[in-house]
């Protein structure tokens, strides 16, 4: 991961961010720092601080991380997530922490992720959300959710409150045959696991950032229909009651006006599965806003 950050072309140059990117995105209502691992960027603290100083009040700023960050980055995130950081600036700040399976991470690194998660949640219970990649019907999804639930219980989450775990199916990438994907035929099996986990953990909710494939619920039983209320899509929209599906006009596909991805060179893409299809470069526009995104 450190090699990726230090490889030319793999991470955004700070001067390019400051001079060419930030002036064009600072009025956007939502900015996410993604990776790789953004917290390993040698100028991460400068990048985050300059974004906070230039963003408009009532906008949203997010950090996508695997939790394996240096102490100086964690210290800044703890300051930012607290009342004297983003809250004082009236910016809604959140950390999205990708929770790995043990086949993808060492015991030592897994403990570091737990340490980071607990520190951020202690500072602000709404400042962090766990994220799971759905890539196989054989993955240890039950173990992942048990570990996350244990963290919330250790921190004393009140019994009348719920927490959301972001889930992201491994979709195919257009033009790339190498990436690992969750086959559509396995969606019902993974969905069955998710239903069982909702039954086991009453405070758990699942959140799909974008579309919700209905076949995830192919194996649901009628007495389990109320559990669907704890599944969200398009960010925070609850999946409608299954009994209303036959009589309602539903759209469960891609969200409108999804954020535009910008790579280290400033090339722009509409969303991750289409990142091989370049739409333009950020330097083509004086400002990135809703109109420029629609134009692209």
PLM region spans:
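Canonical Radical SAM [4Fe-4S] cluster-binding loop centered on the CxxxCxxC motif
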Residues: 1-12, 271-275
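Radical SAM/AdoMet-radical enzyme domain recognition
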Residues: 14-34, 41-183
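Proline-centered helix-kink/hinge sites
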Residues: 38-40, 270
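Generic secondary-structure boundary/loop-capping signal
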Residues: 179, 251, 276-279
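C-terminal accessory region of radical SAM enzymes
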Residues: 188-244, 267-296
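Short, P/G- and charge-enriched loop/turn segments at secondary-structure junctions
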Residues: 245-249
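Short, small/polar residue-rich loop motifs at catalytic or cofactor-binding pockets
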Residues: 253-257
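Short, acidic, Ser/Thr-enriched surface-loop or helix-capping motifs
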Residues: 262-263
């Amino acid at each position: 991961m450190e090699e990726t950050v230090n490889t030319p072309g793999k991470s955004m140059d700070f001067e390019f961010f400051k001079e060419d990117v930030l002036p064009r995105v600072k009025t956007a209502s939502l900015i996410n720092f993604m990776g790789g691992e953004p917290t390993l960027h040698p100028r991460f603290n400068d990048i985050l601080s300059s974004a906070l100083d230039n963003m408009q009040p009532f906008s949203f700023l997010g950090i996508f991380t695997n939790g394996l960050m240096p102490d100086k980055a964690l210290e800044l995130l703890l300051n930012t997530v607290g009342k004297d950081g983003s809250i004082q600036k009236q910016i809604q700040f959140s950390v999205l922490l990708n929770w790995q399976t043990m086949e993808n991470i060492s015991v030592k690194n897994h403990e570091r992720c737990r340490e980071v998660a607990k520190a951020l949640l202690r500072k602000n219970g709404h400042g962090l959300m766990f994220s799971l990649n759905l890539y196989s019907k054989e993955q240890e999804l039950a173990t992942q959710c048990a570990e996350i639930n244990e963290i919330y219980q250790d921190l004393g989450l009140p019994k009348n409150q719920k927490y959301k775990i972001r889930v992201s199916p491994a979709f195919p990438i257009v033009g790339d045959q190498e990436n690992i994907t969750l086959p559509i035929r396995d969606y019902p099996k993974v969905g069955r696991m998710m239903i069982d986990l909702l039954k086991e953990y009453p405070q758990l909710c699942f959140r799909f950032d974008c579309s919700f494939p209905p076949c995830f619920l192919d194996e649901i039983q009628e007495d389990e229909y109320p559990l669907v209320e704890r599944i969200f899509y398009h960010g925070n929209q609850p999946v409608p009651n299954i009994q209303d599906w036959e009589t309602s006009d539903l759209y469960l596909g891609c969200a409108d006006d999804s954020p535009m991805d910008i790579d280290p060179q400033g090339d722009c893409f509409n969303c991750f599965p289409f990142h091989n299809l370049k739409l333009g470069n950020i330097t083509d526009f004086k400002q990135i806003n809703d109109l420029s995104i629609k134009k692209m």
